[in-house]
Amino acid sequence: MTLSPYLQEVAKRRTFAIISHPDAGKTTITEKVLLFGQAIQTAGTVKGRGSSQHAKSDWMEMEKQRGISITTSVMQFPYHDCLVNLLDTPGHEDFSEDTYRTLTAVDCCLMVIDAAKGVEDRTRKLMEVTRLRDTPILTFMNKLDRDIRDPMELLDEVENELKIGCAPITWPIGCGKLFKGVYHLYKDETYLYQTGKGHTIQEVRIVKGLNNPDLDAAVGEDLAQQLRDELELVQGASNEFDEELFLAGEITPVFFGTALGNFGVDHMLDGLVAWAPAPMPRQTDTRTVEASEERFTGFVFKIQANMDPKHRDRVAFMRVVSGKYEKGMKLRQVRTGKDVVISDALTFMAGDRSHVEEAYPGDILGLHNHGTIQIGDTFTQGEMMKFTGIPNFAPELFRRIRLKDPLKQKQLLKGLVQLSEEGAVQVFRPISNNDLIVGAVGVLQFDVVVARLKSEYNVEAIYESVNVATARWVESADAKKFEEFKRKNETQLALDGGDNLTYIAPTMVNLNLTQERYPDVQFRKTREH
């Protein structure tokens, strides 16, 4: 049975994001993935601040200065017979809710681990978010051109700490200065590593068969024998790859390589297009939407300001769930009930924009937004329903924002509300005073906000510490008890950017006591958009 042209397009799509701890090599791997997808001819590695060659996916001004990727950009490239959408996620020492939310818009994740360090804190946090939807995970053990930890130990650590089985697909031969290449367990082939070839795609020498004397000649007898011994152990002790368990998020195929040396990335990409799911169904408040449905649906997971420094516009990123987008199409924005004609949707290659004529499930569209689109908005061809599972996360860090020029209060509030709508920060306005408190998941968000207030809204602000430890969204079915709660806790209540009532607690102890005192009030850690 041949698929219809529409279903053929759907089947070709793979949409994934990369999760890693800062400095595990995520930006480098992004570069190399794009190189293999021939989206860029030479991978511009991220060098120090003075370098003129900036990595393709780090593109706001602050990112250029710091060498870190702050905004989640989207890159689409062809690979074999597939079209791959890679959603880049902020991965430096500080990241934001954008990173969490981007993981709700993909069908698969690539986890990049620094093989010298193993599982690190950020990787754990991001894996927890992928667990909300049992997202399938591929794993790339990076930096084999450095001295690494024992590979068996690394697999054990992933299994024990992240509670996911490991199925090695390739296995390393040596590491650091002695790194010779990897052996593919399922193809019975050894791929030999050459140094100094990191910027372009090279022909790799392949040795067929584990017992081929050419292998001993190529890597030396000692390493060849060590490989055979290790593989006996590996095949006895680790999981075999099973596609069903992978799709259920229970096991992860593991690849070894060095992104900087451009080695092993193609093996991982081959696995991604072969095994990662085509666009998946998604839940709404009324039903499940299948990617095979021909009527258009999509949801907004991120809003980015000022992608074009020459224009003060904002772009909403929408994941297509079903149906085909065509230029000039009329779509209903469910939250407002308004029909809008989308004539100029964009597709991206990190900051380079091009207009899209058509898009399919799994693709990401950029919609011009003049303040009318919010995170979590659903677009359909008329059906009134809302996609679920795109949450706001309670901030973990808080600062008070103060103006250098008190006359600019209005611009400040406008700027903060707009920044909160796009998820750059959350803003809270205490009911009992005129303070403005911003909440974030990571510290750098505060610097980003101050820098953007200045460059986009011409408002000079500084932030200072504030006595807030945590925040919870509050609601209650019992109107009378809720009124009493509000009356007695006025000094701890604030409205967020969307005017939702929030309890801001000075300490965790205070929060726990208040929750005990008011059992009829719900204190929520996440809030659906």
Swiss-Prot record:
Species of provenance: Salmonella typhi
Gene assigned in the entry: prfC
Gene Ontology molecular functions: GTP binding; GTPase activity; guanosine tetraphosphate binding; translation release factor activity, codon nonspecific; translation release factor activity, codon specific
Stretches assigned to the tr-type G domain: 11-280
Protein name: Peptide chain release factor 3
GO process annotations (BP): regulation of translational termination
PROSITE patterns documented for this protein: G_TR_1 (PS00301), G_TR_2 (PS51722)
Superkingdom of the organism of origin: Bacteria
Residues involved in GTP binding: 20-27, 88-92, 142-145
Presence of keyword Coiled coil: no
Subcellular location: Cytoplasm
